[in-house]
A protein has these predicted regions:
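Hydrophobic/small/kink-forming positions within alpha-helical transmembrane segments
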Residues: 22-27, 51, 58, 82-90, ...
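C-terminal transmembrane-helix exit sites in multi-pass transporters
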Residues: 92-94, 112-133, 205, 252-271
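Hydrophobic transmembrane alpha-helices of multi-pass small-molecule transport proteins
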Residues: 130-146, 269-288
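Transmembrane alpha-helical segments that form core, pore/gating elements
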Residues: 33, 149-209, 296-302
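Transmembrane alpha-helices of multi-pass small-molecule transport proteins
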Residues: 13, 40-87, 166-169, 189-204
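Helix-helix packing/entry segments at the starts of transmembrane helices
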Residues: 105-110, 177-192, 228-260
């Protein structure tokens, strides 16, 4: 085999970091589902995700930009972004009360297709007929997973779709400010403002957590921050269009984690629908790569 060139080495490192992040992030859902089974309100898990996420990213932000980086440059804009991220996180965590992790994630994967469909309206981007066809195929994949008319559409399916839509709107807002500041700084601002919103929302339903639940709250923040850090580092080594399809490898660990911790396993039709979604997303990524389009480096996982 030919020796590894520096550029090829960077690409392989970026791919490895992205795959590592996708192997780690499903455990965020495992912890959230476990907290729900312990009877804690969903909003408390959302609050922990935001509050501990802000706390754990704080040292990185201080290292990147010092104390000046703690103040958002566009606070109202970041506040709306935080609101969409909270809506996505809340809807997804709530969907885990009704669905296995892999099923909820499969429906949630409609998010990049929604971004593509709405980008002409929100961002004025051009989407050609081939990418529209890929979006339509992805929507068909979502219908295969949900199968309306062939099975009862559970509240969890609706919540997972709402999570995908909310995160799509969050990502569209992220694209508008992409490149203005470091991704970690932007993420910190979103988590900080999100923690403020979540604090107000969780106050009326707050239940005193037990010590083990405080530990799970911290674990939510550690997993989310660790996964995000790996993704940021991956984007430092590879272009976005190469890494974007790798996000779908998260389904592998989500399936394993759901089976191991909760005894859940998706049915065959779910895998068929996920296959259609992945094919659609990979095609869209290839088209964007050929067009020279970059997806935003800022990334969030509900």
């Amino acid at each position: 085999m030919p020796p590894t060139t520096p550029e090829r080495g960077r690409t392989l490192t970026g791919v490895a970091l992205m795959l590592g992040a996708m192997a780690l992030l499903p455990f965020l859902d495992v912890v959230a589902k476990h907290l729900g089974q312990r009877g804690l309100p969903v909003m408390q898990a959302v609050w922990a995700r935001m509050a501990f996420g802000a706390l754990l990213t704080l040292p990185f932000v201080l290292r990147i930009g010092g104390a000046a980086a703690l103040v958002p440059d566009r606070p109202v804009y970041h506040l709306f972004r935080a609101g969409f991220l909270i809506a996505a996180t809340f809807s997804f965590f709530w969907s885990l009360k009704y669905l296995p992790i892999a099923d909820a994630l499969a429906i949630f994967f409609v998010q990049p297709l929604i971004v593509t469909a709405l980008s002409p309206l929100v961002l004025g981007e051009h989407v050609g007929p081939r990418r529209w066809a890929a979006v339509a195929a992805g929507f068909l994949g979502t219908l295969v997973i949900i199968r309306p008319g062939f099975q009862t559409v559970s509240p969890g399916m609706v919540l997972a779709l709402m999570a995908g839509l909310s995160l799509a709107l969050y990502m569209l807002m992220t694209r508008r400010i992409s490149g203005r500041s470091h991704a970690m700084v932007t993420t910190f601002h979103t988590s900080l403002l999100g923690a403020g919103i979540a604090t107000l929302a969780v106050w009326p339903v707050w239940q005193a957590p037990e010590p083990v639940e405080w530990g799970l709250f911290l674990l939510l923040g550690v997993i989310a921050t660790g996964g995000h850090f790996l993704i940021v580092r991956a984007y430092d080594h590879c272009e976005a269009s190469l890494l974007a399809p790798l996000a779908y490898t998260e389904m592998v660990m989500a399936t394993v984690a759901g089976w191991w911790f909760f005894g859940d396993f998706p049915d065959g039709w779910t895998f068929v629908g996920v296959g259609i979604l992945i094919a659609s997303a990979v095609y869209i990524s290839i088209r964007e790569r050929k067009a020279g389009a970059e997806t935003p480096r800022d990334f969030e996982q509900p």
